[in-house]
Amino acid sequence: MKPHRTRFLTISAVTAATAMVVAACSSSGSTNTSGNGNAKPVVIGASLSLTGDFSADGQAFKRGYELWASEVNKTGGLLGRKVQLVFQNDASDPTTVATNYTKLIAQQKVNLVFGPFSTLLTVPAAKVAARYGYAFPEGAGGGPAVYQLKLPNVFNPSPPIADQLVPFADWVAALPATERPKTAAYPQVNDPFADPMTEAAQSILQKAGVRTVYSKIYPAENPDYKAGADAVAATGAQMVVLGSVDVPTATAFIQAFEQQHYNPKIFAASSGPDQGADFVKAVGAKNTNGIMVPNGWYAGLPNPLSQAFVKAYVAKYGGSPSDINADSAEGYSVGEITAAAVKATHSVDNKKIISFLHSSVTLQTVQGPVKFNSVGENVVAQKFIFQWQTGPKFVQVLPSSASGSVPIVNPKPAWSS
């Protein structure tokens, strides 16, 4: 293992790296965005899943990163220098993501890096960044597998995922016995993001007397979700808690359930339904009704920074607030904490940025307050449960006492067919 070290870039090195990136874009698949100005840009590199299983999320993160850079550049950039983003496509592959960050840091010599999508890809990527002494702000690697590494350079402004379904499970457990489902199914992808939160919910619900009639983790390679969904339907479980990581996984189960005329009274998924217009388009507006999902952000969040983000997003990309994928807000938050650190330290020195983010300072982002512990978890993160309701509208339902929460639709309405 190579020793940890920080690389300091001279102005000429940044210029050379920038020229190399621009020259390579047409042949390597990299893309870059930058503002105008005479000062040399602050070059920030990121590997994202622009193709492959996580491509919808990767594209959403890219929009979040790009919107942040655009907004920052409108006000003069960082330290009076425009921000330039450089992207590499990891095709949703853990080996490729490690190669990409090595290339960004060691060859292209970017000033800073942002993280990829998913816990699966964050683990190898963060190790590379740590080896070179780079701060690693990221918004989608919230699984225990990331924090168990105990790396000093990881900082995630999004909520830790292990307990994100706890508010949902507590709500079900507290239902009157006549309303509480008696049986539940827990189909899960083999993923370090989905599994911890699904299993935490299952533990709470079993203690509340909800009997598990199906629990299976599908292999990462060539999972047969259609067969799995049919097996869940055959149990007649009154509740389904789906450990999913993306829109395609959630869609596969929903479509199979509809074909089987199986409609659980309560249906929650760990991810997929939080992805706005992408989810609605995939399953149909009527089939979203009643589905629940955890997250730390939605377009109606009563947060001035979030409201400004929503306005800027719609102005740049079009559509309506409900179309915005929560991944874009997570990516934008990564930019916000980075900007705060750069401004506070008056530098793009990764060692200083790491030290600042570990100083117990509380920062404000579109997702709410952020304060990091020693392993980079946001210990003051807001956790919400959302539900799709008639419209379709994506609304906050839990905690019920939180500002902006509306009553839960229970039981879930029937599928559109």
Predicted regions and their residues:
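Signal peptide-proximal N-terminal region
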Residues: V42, R63-Q84, E179, Q206-V210
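Beta-alpha junction/loop-to-helix N-cap segments that form part of ligand/metal-binding clefts
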Residues: H4, T31-S34, V43, A56-F61, ...
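Segments of small-molecule ligand-sensing domains
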Residues: K316-S328, A339-V397
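Short, low-complexity disordered leader/linker segments with a strong preference
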Residues: M1-V43, K74, K412-S417
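Extracellular/periplasmic periplasmic-binding protein-like sensory domains
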Residues: F257-Y332, S400-G404, P411-S416
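Extracytoplasmic ligand/sensor domains, especially the bilobed periplasmic-binding protein
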Residues: K109-S215, K265-N289
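Extracytoplasmic "Venus flytrap"
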Residues: N36-E66, Q88-T95, F117-S118, P187-P196, ...
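Extracytoplasmic/secreted proteins, especially bacterial periplasmic and envelope-associated proteins
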Residues: A56, A60-L67, E71, T96-K103, ...
